[in-house]
């Protein structure tokens, strides 16, 4: 079953609490919170205190996507802030297994994200310890980019490997999602899409 997780990158940052409540009311399954530090990616967004402040505005899961250097250092802060899923990049400078285990020990779901140039096989050693894998279909750091359909073989490869092992693994795609690109993502094996929060209350 396909799930939808709106990204905060297209929110009105002056009304984020209202935006979160609206997205839940409109039927969002999760909320995708992009955390950027200006180092791992060139843009800069928000940190754990803002995530904590937003937690009361929605009851659906918060998927916090750490596009930051040294995510291991900041995992405890985001766990305390109310992150239900913590996604960090396999390309970051933190030890992958240690970071996964810290997230698991804190009671949240660990997830790994791959930049477009990173092959699917990079996450295979960790699949048994993950709740999900995020495949970037744009270069991370900015909204409004075009969907990279050539990432779909990567999604399909991860789905095949997860199915071969009998894993109940969520696979998400992030970037350039629209009505035109959903079908390609679903066909490749993605089950969760990160989108811009465009729907409005009826």
Label each PLM-derived region with a short phrase:
Residues 1-76, 80, 129, 179:
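Conserved N-terminal beta1-alpha1 strand-loop-helix module at the mouth
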Residues 4-7, 31-33, 62-66, 86-88, ...:
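Hydrophobic faces of well-ordered beta-strands that scaffold small-molecule active sites
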Residues 20-21, 48-52, 75, 97-100, ...:
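Generic structural signal for well-ordered alpha-helices
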Residues 27-28, 58-59, 80-86, 104-109, ...:
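Glycine-enriched alpha-helix->loop->beta-strand junction motifs that scaffold or abut catalytic
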Residues 48-63, 108, 152-165:
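Alpha-helix-loop-beta-strand connector modules within alpha/beta enzyme cores
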Residues 73-77, 118-123, 177-190:
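Catalytic cores of alpha/beta
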Residues 85-154, 161, 166-168:
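Conserved anion-binding
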């Amino acid at each position: 079953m396909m799930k939808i997780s709106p990204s905060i990158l297209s929110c009105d940052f002056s009304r984020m609490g209202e935006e979160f409540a609206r997205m839940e009311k409109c039927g969002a399954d999760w909320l995708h919170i992009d955390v950027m530090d200006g180092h791992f990616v060139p843009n800069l967004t928000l940190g754990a205190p803002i995530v904590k402040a937003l937690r009361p505005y929605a009851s659906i899961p918060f998927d916090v996507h750490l596009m930051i250097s040294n995510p291991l250092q900041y995992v405890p802060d985001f766990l305390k802030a109310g992150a239900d899923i913590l996604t960090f990049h396999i390309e970051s400078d933190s030890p992958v297994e240690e970071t996964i285990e810290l997230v698991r020990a804190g009671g949240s779901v660990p997830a790994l994200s791959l930049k477009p140039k990173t092959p699917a096989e990079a996450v295979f050693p960790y699949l048994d310890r993950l709740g999900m894998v995020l495949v970037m279909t744009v270069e991370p750091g900015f909204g409004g980019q075009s969907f990279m359909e050539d990432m779909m073989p990567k999604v399909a490869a991860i789905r095949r490997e997860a199915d071969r092992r009998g894993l109940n693994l969520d696979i998400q795609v992030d970037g350039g999602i629209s009505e035109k690109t959903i079908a390609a993502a679903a066909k490749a094996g993605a089950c969760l899409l990160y989108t811009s929060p465009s729907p409005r209350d009826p």
